[in-house]
Amino acid sequence: GNPAWSERLVDWFRLHGAPDDVTAELVGQSSFYRPFIRYQRDPLLMREGELLDGWQLVGAAGHADGQLCLLKDGVLIAADHLLDRITPTVGLWPASRPDPLGDYLAALDRTQELDPRIALSGHGEPIEDPAGRARELQEHHRLRLEETVASLGPEPQTGYELSFALFGDDLKPVSRRFAIAESLSHAERLVLAGAARRGEDGGTVTYTAA
C-alpha cells in the first residue's frame, strides 16, 4: 500500500529475475493488506533481555527483523516465531538483515535453551512442546537447504527461477511472492556457508552451486 515500499518491491523482484508483468502482479498483491495494518502512534522501543511488566523480552529475528517474544513463568508469547501446523515465512526482503534464515535458526536454538513449557503463537493452537517444535522447524529448514543445493548447478539461476524448483509452478501471486523471498533466504544462507555462489548477470542477481 505504501508507494515508496511498492517501488522498492518492484526493483527487488526485478533484481531477482521476475519478469515485469509478474512483478506488477506480485507487488499489486501487497496493497490488499494495507487496510488491515494499524501502526502504533508512540511505540516503545525495547531490546532483548529487558523486562516488560514482568515479562522477559526474547529476541526472535527471522520471520521479521527485530521480532521479540515474551517469556514469563514458562509461557512464551511467540508471535510468528513458532507456529503449530505451518512454518513461519523466513524470507529475504529489500530491507532485511543479510541472513534472515541464519537469524531464525539461531533464535530456534535460543528457544530450545529456554525450554518454555508452552508457547502461544500468532496463528493456530497453543504449542505444548515449544522446544520440540523448534527442533522440527530447524529440521524443515535443513531439508530445504538440501533441496536448494540440489536445485543449484553450474548454470546461474535467479531467485525467481529457484522458487519454481523449490515450491512448484502452481502458486497464486501472494504465495509466489513469499516463495521468492524464502528461496532467496535459503540461497543466501548457502552463500554464507560456502555451498553456493552469488553472481550478477545484466543487473540480475543469480546463484550457482559452489
PLM features per residue range, with description:
Residues 45-54:
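Cytochrome P450 C-terminal beta-domain/meander region
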